[in-house]
């Protein structure tokens, strides 16, 4: 997308009233999502209009939109309400004693369901040593593409190669990258993604992708009508026939969130992930350069999330200046997305320089 078209499209959808650099916590909702999705369903519900409570067709359109963004078919996508729901499904399907390899400091939703079982062998290693740590006894490697605490990018090619060499499966949490970093979800056995950050969806949207081969390893824990081949024919009694696709792993959707998600995902498809990636990483690079110029050393990398170790205590002062960032693990964390500008970067640098 041309720069002028990019700017016009973004300006038509967003009007932040502060310097919002906190998409790694929660993304802003586009105007079309609020008005054409969420508010429209709320109004229908209030009036008792059909479909009122929500539409399976809308959920399936959101599924297809997400699939298009991550390079798989809709038949490889299951929906839910949180990353932990999907990770819990995978954790429940592992054999007793299976070895799970995760990075130290990984976000809790990606590791907690495995650790909570109590009968799995958990191994924690530094992020930059993940590939070397895979061994023949490893059953699953679980990691985020971009770390929540500091924005570091994992060496995903090396991890996949090591896992393949030792017969281990890979679970990728793309919550902090989907929406700005190009992703080929089909290259992983499983991916999980929360929709409320860089995908700009309302909270309550999440997506699981699973390859056709890896699908056979999972148990359909949420086998209600959403997981049935014939939804409306499976309202009562046990589901006689599960969907043959990844939809068999669907959890009950928060319809209000998915009615909005359809529009948010359509916006990202219109703009293009490559264009968003170029925009976001350029702003992040400007911020890193500016930080170095005022005596701060950010975590290096070409990522849309910038973290400065030991500077998290400045978050309240930035908030008073109208700048929204996060304090994560002692890091000052700023995240850049399509609605941010160079003026946002410069405003944050000006306050930090005082």
Q: What are the residue ranges of the model-derived segments?
A:
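Pyridoxal 5′-phosphate
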Residues: 1-354
